[in-house]
């Protein structure tokens, strides 16, 4: 007689199984394609007929399951089948699962549903027919064929449930093979099905070992963890209702629902009343000398889990196995234990009408016992509290590591959802990361879809924000006499404002008010104001508590005053947070609180920074000596007073430097990725005024030229306040501080090279929704045309503009390279790499019309070192 070696025989069986699984998967793939051609209406009709057929056969299927498994209660299984068909259908019937399922026109989003693919459905012996109905319905509702691996001990009843819904589906127009199953169940067959390349997702319900296998397939899996449900009856609970809920829940189908109560914790104050109520309803309390017998009867030898044969048996059957005499009408066995954990085996999940009871000496102890119960094999599943104290209900929910925290509810039927609460109805309950699951909610049809999003391009909403009031013309300072609520004024300025009598001018105007305000002056602002100066001024501000802050001076005074205002209004503000870079000012990671108390007024005494109308302030960190541009709409002044009388005596060199700063503001804001119809006109007018009046403003210092440049400064400020700047400012911020070059002069030196750089086709394109294509070259050409410069091509116009900027700088006395500013070649070589990196990090870089690489920034700095035109 020929004997086949065991190993070879095993290999042959595995091959047979593989052939079978391949055939099922191939049919499933064809069914998937056929289902994809069905409309939403056709799918809904098919699933509705499946649910009706399951309702019609719910008693027959329950009887089959009860007879085949020998577990649970026939009548309860019938209810579960009815729930799986009726409640599930009611929950999913209106779900859109085919094609376009939603549209948000405002956001430009269209949602498209597509099936996951062929699903492997694994079902348990505890709820065989109801789980089959449930999984088949949610699979077909979402256009997914399903192949079942039934539990061997419930193969025939599960198979019949699948046949019932499949026959109904096909009569309703469904293609064949949308529901299939393994005919000869085995661990090997289930394993091969779960791991088959044709399976898109594993939908697993069963023991922890099987669920773990599902998650180890390397493909999406929806599996659930085991339950070990604590139920806390707190002293304010409605005792009769709580006991009724627990008895009904724990005895339902002989405790086989994984969400059923396992350990009941009772406050000592009501312990006797609760136990008496249990006894009044045929619950048997195990005597001390019977406890060990009960443990031995239902727990395995290692006391690490329940014996499989015990699952779903009646209380009387279990008592008989344990040798414990109980009345014939006993419906529940209760074991009083004093703790939870391995020393108390009955505190584990029991899946039978056996309940552990623990007396709690306090709410704190009760919470701890419930928490320990979850950690003892039930993490993530379900926890219950019976109490009338709403605060305690929330505290319990916050404390327990359970994805379903039920209040005043029978756990078994509460956890599955929709009967006692608004949880999604389901027979597969996710336990989240606590239970090593991928989901934390009740599984339903929406979990079996790929949702595609068609996202239309949209521009970010932009805002044009400037001070609420801008006063201009000579003697605009007189507006201070009529403004509301000026009672305590703090003037922030540099020492020169006091020395040259400007603060006195402001004081004299303020004293013309009907009620003269109190006035304090902080006059210690230095060029490039530091955090130390800001904090010093803040100290005076906090002590004085002004209702009005007046920043008088150039950019340094206004920037320092803005920072003081920021900290004064919101002391919790962090300079570290405020200095951080952002891509979108409306989405910035760190928000500066909007001011609520003091009115902030800016009176510029130079024509350059535009700070009087911008949400920006440049502050130097005293610890690192690095300049940081702060940017937030909270820093926008309330009032700007543009009075040319304050700039008539500004020295020529300062007028030249600040004038070139105006030009840089205007040009960078014009080509910025955030430039808009609201800003470009301001930019162009500022450019025009600068080219027309800067030279005479420097050389002659006449009233008309100075006033025009003062206006140009504010126009450019309004433009860049809303369109932002670019890498000229990014670099100038860094090299100005490093080499001691005035900010406007640094911009003047850099601007011609920035124009040429930005006008070349980018190596890295800028990314901003409104900036639809690279246009910096034509933008610069448009500026050149506006100024009447010569050029027959875009390139020629760009070059004319760069040369015109260089010549304007020279004409006002600026040496247009870094070397002429006293920067040695040694200094440059030592710092250039660091400067380039810091410039890239600068806030202004993000709005540049093309993304600048650090190497390119370095080249710009190098070129500007000894450049001559």
Feature roles, as predicted:
Residues 738, 744-830:
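Gly/Pro-rich interdomain helix-loop hinge
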Residues 8, 17, 133, 211-334, ...:
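ALDH superfamily catalytic-core signature
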Residues 280, 613-723:
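Carboxylate- and glycine-rich phosphate/diphosphate-binding segment that chelates Mg2+/Mn2+
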Residues 10, 324-460:
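Conserved C-terminal structural/oligomerization subdomain of aldehyde/semialdehyde dehydrogenase
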Residues 2-110, 138, 280:
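N-terminal Rossmann-like NAD(P)+-binding subdomain of aldehyde/semialdehyde dehydrogenases
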Residues 96, 161, 532-645:
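Glycine/threonine-rich beta-strand-loop-alpha-helix active-site module
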Residues 461-548, 818-819:
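ATP/NTP phosphate-donor binding region
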Residues 100-241:
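Rossmann-like NAD(P) dinucleotide-binding subdomain of oxidoreductase/dehydrogenase enzymes
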């Amino acid at each position: 007689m020929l004997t086949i070696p065991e190993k070879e025989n095993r290999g042959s069986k595995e091959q047979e199984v593989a052939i079978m699984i391949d055939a099922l998967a191939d049919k499933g793939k064809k069914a998937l394609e056929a289902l994809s051609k069905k409309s939403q209406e056709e799918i809904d009709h098919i699933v509705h007929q499946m649910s009706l057929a399951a309702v019609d056969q719910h008693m027959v299927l329950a009887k089959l399951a009860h007879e085949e498994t020998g577990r649970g209660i026939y009548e309860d299984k019938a209810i579960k089948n009815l729930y799986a068909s009726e409640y599930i259908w009611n929950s999913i019937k209106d779900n859109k699962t085919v094609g376009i399922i939603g549209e948000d026109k405002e956001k430009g989003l269209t949602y498209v549903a597509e099936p996951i693919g062929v699903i492997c459905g694994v079902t348990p012996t505890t709820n065989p027919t109801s789980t089959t109905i449930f999984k088949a319905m949610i699979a077909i509702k979402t256009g997914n064929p399903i192949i079942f691996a039934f539990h061997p001990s419930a193969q025939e009843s599960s198979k019949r449930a699948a046949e019932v819904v499949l026959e109904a589906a096909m009569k309703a127009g469904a293609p064949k093979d949308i529901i299939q199953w393994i005919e000869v169940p085995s661990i090997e067959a289930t394993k091969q099905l779960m791991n088959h390349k044709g399976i898109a997702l594993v939908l697993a319900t069963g023991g922890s070992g099987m669920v773990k296998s599902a998650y180890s397939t390397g493909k999406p899996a929806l599996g659930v963890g085991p339950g070990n449900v604590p139920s806390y009856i707190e002293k304010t609970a409605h005792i009769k209702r709580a006991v009724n809920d627990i008895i009904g829940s724990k005895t339902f189908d002989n405790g086989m629902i994984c969400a059923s109560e396992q350990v009941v914790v009772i406050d000592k104050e009501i312990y006797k009343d609760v136990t008496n109520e249990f006894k009044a309803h045929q619950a048997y309390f195990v005597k001390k000398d019977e406890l060990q017998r009960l443990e031995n009867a239902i727990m395995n030898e290692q006391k690490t889990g329940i014996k499989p044969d015990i699952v779903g048996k009646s209380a009387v059957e279990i008592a008989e196995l344990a040798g414990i005499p109980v009345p014939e009408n006993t419906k529940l066995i209760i074991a009083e234990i004093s703790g939870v954990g391995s020393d108390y085996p009955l505190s584990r999940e029991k899946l039978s009408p056996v309940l552990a009871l623990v007396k709690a000496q306090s709410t704190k102890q009760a919470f701890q016992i419930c928490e320990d119960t979850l950690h003892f094999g039930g993490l993530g599943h379900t926890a219950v509290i019976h109490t009338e104290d709403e605060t305690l209900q929330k505290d319990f929910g916050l404390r327990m590591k359970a994805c379903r925290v039920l209040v005043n509810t029978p756990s078994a039927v509460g956890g599955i959802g929709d009967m006692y609460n608004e949880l999604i109805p389901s027979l597969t309950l996710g336990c989240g990361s606590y239970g090593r699951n991928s989901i934390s909610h009740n599984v339903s049809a929406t979990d079996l879809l790929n949702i595609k999003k068609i996202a239309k391009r949209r521009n970010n909403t932009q805002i044009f924000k400037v001070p609420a009031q801008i006063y201009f013309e000579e003697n605009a300072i007189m507006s201070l006499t009529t403004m509301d609520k000026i009672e305590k004024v703090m003037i922030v300025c540099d020492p020169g404002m006091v020395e040259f009598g400007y603060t006195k001018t402001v004081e004299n105007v303020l004293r013309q008010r009907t009620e003269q305000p109190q006035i304090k002056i902080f006059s210690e602002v230095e060029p490039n104001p530091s955090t130390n100066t800001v904090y010093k001024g803040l100290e005076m501000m906090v002590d004085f508590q002004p209702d009005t802050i007046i920043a008088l001076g150039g950019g340094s005074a206004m920037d320092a005053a803005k920072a003081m205002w920021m900290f004064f209004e919101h002391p919790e503000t962090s300079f570290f947070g405020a200095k951080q870079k952002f891509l979108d000012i409306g989405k910035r990671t760190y928000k500066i609180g909007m001011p609520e108390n003091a009115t902030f007024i800016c009176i510029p005494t130079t024509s350059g920074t535009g700070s009087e109308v911008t949400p920006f302030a440049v502050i130097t960190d005293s610890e690192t000596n690095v300049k940081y541009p702060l940017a937030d709409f909270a820093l926008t002044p309330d009032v700007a007073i543009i009075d040319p009388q304050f700039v008539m005596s500004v020295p020529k060199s300062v007028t030249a430097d600040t004038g070139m700063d105006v030009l840089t503001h205007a040009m960078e804001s014009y080509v910025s990725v955030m430039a808009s119809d609201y800003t470009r006109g301001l930019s162009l007018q500022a450019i025009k005024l600068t080219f027309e009046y800067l030279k005479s403003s420097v050389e002659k210092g006449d009233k008309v030229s100075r006033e025009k440049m003062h206006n140009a400064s504010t126009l450019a400020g309004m433009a860049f306040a809303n369109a932002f700047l670019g890498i000229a400012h990014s670099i100038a911020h860094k090299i100005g501080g490093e080499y001691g070059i005035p900010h406007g002069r640094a911009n003047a030196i850099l601007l011609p090279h920035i124009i040429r750089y930005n006008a070349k086709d980018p190596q890295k394109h800028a990314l901003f929704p409104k900036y639809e294509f690279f246009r910096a070259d034509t933008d610069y050409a448009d500026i050149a045309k506006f100024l009447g410069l010569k050029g027959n091509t875009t390139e020629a116009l760009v070059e004319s503009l760069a040369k015109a900027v260089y010549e304007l700088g020279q004409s006002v006395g600026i040496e247009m390279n870094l070397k002429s500013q006293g920067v040695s070649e040694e200094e440059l070589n030592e710092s250039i790499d660091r400067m380039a990196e810091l410039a890239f990090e600068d806030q202004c870089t993000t709005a540049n019309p093309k993304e600048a690489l650090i190497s390119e920034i370095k080249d710009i700095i190098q070129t500007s070192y000894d450049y001559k035109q």
